[in-house]
């Protein structure tokens, strides 16, 4: 369970919790209760998992649950679309952090463009509009796009609305924290971070195992990771996720076709711009 994210202004409020276990800045509800009662607290592992396709939840099972989960959902035998995909941006450091603008935050326009590329039509033989066909299930979404950063989520939401040829469907672009308790037929995770010095500094937040666990396990049938061209080599969990997808299907780790003349400003840029 992910803990809440607080406004930095609250750090100046000098109200101390009665006990460390009640410190809302350090604990989620689950960790608070565990801290209070310790080993006296009864624990039950809910082993049967019904939400995700087996290929999706197996990553979480091996990475976070010591292989104790039992996948109860079977993949449809007539489903031609890949369950797992990785879509990489072209070479370059595309993350930006706005500090002095009216809108502050961290985002990657190239990853936003890559998501638009995915949901706007046919990519590597996969028609995303067909993947999103069918009926909605309960309160879940047809398409979910999760990201660690608020600004990225907001700009992705705007991108979804501007994709005119998408069918009418239930979609949500939100931070990973806001996706707790929710699910989507197809889930996209945008990591945002790049290989710049600031990107490396932000990796500790983005590569949190609880964050990746929540993001991946929201996907019911399809999961797509959108990340930087170098595959976040300094990460642990994200790198393991990419390796897992590559092991399942090497052909589903691909590079985005989205290019920009501004890529020429980077030391490393796509050779396609020389054509």
Where are these regions (language model features)?
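Conserved helicase motor core of SF1/SF2 NTP-dependent helicases
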Residues: 1-275
